[in-house]
Amino acid sequence: MNPVIKTFQFGQSTVTLETGRIARQASGAVLVTIDDEVAVLVTVVAAKQADPGKGFFPLSVHYQEKTYAAGRIPGGFFKREGRPSEKETLTSRLIDRPIRPLFPEGFMNEVQVICTVLSTSKKTDPDIASMIGTSAALAVSGIPFNGPIGAARVGFHEETGYLLNPSYEQLKASRLDMVVAGTESAVLMVESEAEELTEDQMLGAVLFAHEEFQAVIQAIKEFAAETGRSAWDWQPPVENTALLEAIRAEFGEAISQAYTITVKQERYGRLDELREQTIARLAGDAEGQPSVAEVKEAFGLIEYRTVRQNIVDGKPRIDGRDNRTVRPLKIEVGVLPKTHGSALFTRGETQALVVATLGTARDAQVLDTLEGERKDSFMLHYNFPPFSVGECGRMGSAGRREIGHGRLARRGVQAMLPKDDSFPYTVRVVSEITESNGSSSMASVCGASLALMDAGVPMKAPVAGIAMGLVKEGEKFAVLTDILGDEDHLGDMDFKVAGTAAGVTALQMDIKIQGITEEIMEIALNQALEARLHILGQMGQVIGQSRSELSSNAPTMLSMKIDQDKIRDVIGKGGATIRAICEETKASIDIEDDGSIKIFGETREAAEAAKQRVLSITAEAEIGKIYVGKVERIVDFGAFVNILPGKDGLVHISQISDQRIEKVTDVLKEGQEVKVLVLDVDNRGRIKLSIKDVAAAEASGV
């Protein structure tokens, strides 16, 4: 194929799409360049043969950042890129979510998308370029795909309104960081964090992005047409209506009854029984008989249609609730005696044990990014062990799902944390999901807010989260509050909202179908607000605001400031002085270039002891003040007495006594402790001391 290049304007940026020059053996490959600064190569490869035994669509997306893109060499011993960073994992998920529902039902060929960042200016995130490139690569590949999609980042400022694809610098002043992706007619994915924006402002941002990325979709359509690549000759598998009718006739009523069992494990047990009975009754190896896999797939389709029809017909949900009711809540704080802050948040059959830990500035996570090294003083980690769903499973490092859910929960609470300059602790929150039946990430938001308040972290306001769902059949639809796991799996939308009583702090939306209108999104947001306020009210009855003092288990932090020319005295030669203070007091000390000092101690006593040591090192001798010092050295004309760490003064022989002294050693000995009065400090820092004037000074009340 001859190279094809398409250039178009996207907001203030010039975007260039190129194919046919690089990676020509891939099914589709596009080099995306934005403003001659960001360049991302996106390749798509699809297997020629289907893999129907998978049971799910085998799509994988890999976003990778090469350090050479920013003119850097990787750190570490091996000096090459290693396992995906958290940023790469999150961006891979961001690209996966809007494209997955656009592959046609029944398409089971493995598809792999690889996005490689080749160049970046460090001014903007390459994720939007990667999403545009993925859409374009799929469009030119000929693989069955109901696209193209567009994508945009949106910021918000009170004075300027919505910003399209803001830079990192613009995002610092923005109250919103939102990524939206969708097709020409529908929004499919939203990922955002905000500073208490209203529901209307959030919806406005979604609609603004959808309108703006129409330019991307139109350009990709024209680009794909120019390549002239023919579409795959693929036909969807024919639905086995006879098998579906047989299952519905014999087991349909039993399946419907199973979905009235409110306890999850009992319901799953009954459905497993029915599935096995169906397989035994209908599957076989004889000619014309369906296979076990075909029967399982058909059984799942009957489940899907049964639950959805019940919901749109207005029947009670699986657990008997109506569409607006939140499951019963049980909220506890301070559940672990030796942690800094803890909470146990239970919503129905979903439960999160959340623990907050405070650390020093040295505990901050160091992130090695394309933009350079930076520190992160807030971490939220989400763990989903297999026992939470009553299963045996893999244990090990966090998977993509856990990283994604942890980041969503972090987005929910981060805006309500105090700024580093007023609360210089590193904060780590860990959410252990101990039970799961829907929306464990939003349980993590609620639990994180509770644990942070229990630890005494001065939160601006409590935060709660809720997951909404949608079932749409034709013109009929139902928006569901606080969805169960089954409703998430069988529904058309997963819509998670976190926020305070005043506004939204995080919004995540994944839509599996087209045709979600502005009206439906507005209903979902307002219904989520109602549920969020209900949960906040319940949380407020247990703990309404942060505790007035930090947990007694948390480290004590003391702040002070010294003159910049004293920093070297505190550090000492080769760090000897500060190291000795830390070892002796068991505290840690962080010194900034401007002289700001933060002292962290496991106990208040340890922190105070370290502070006093620093004060004694940096203190200046005050004229007229009495000190207790030690005689360090005796000379013919007097004695040198140490009154402060590193500060000696001279007691002239005439200042030792009112009586005449022939030899200093007749009165003083090295190592002897004496009281001295500071008479003067000259402009070279030399200190003049007196022993004989101490009595008079004490009598006058010095």
From Swiss-Prot:
GO terms for cellular component: cytosol. This is Polyribonucleotide nucleotidyltransferase. It is an enzyme of class 2 (transferase). Mg(2+) binds at residues 488, 494. Residues 624-692 form the S1 motif domain. Keywords: Cytoplasm, Magnesium, Metal-binding, Nucleotidyltransferase, RNA-binding, Transferase. Signal peptide: none annotated. The gene is pnp. Component of the RNA degradosome, which is a multiprotein complex involved in RNA processing and mRNA degradation. Its main location: cytoplasm. Residues 555-614 form the KH domain.
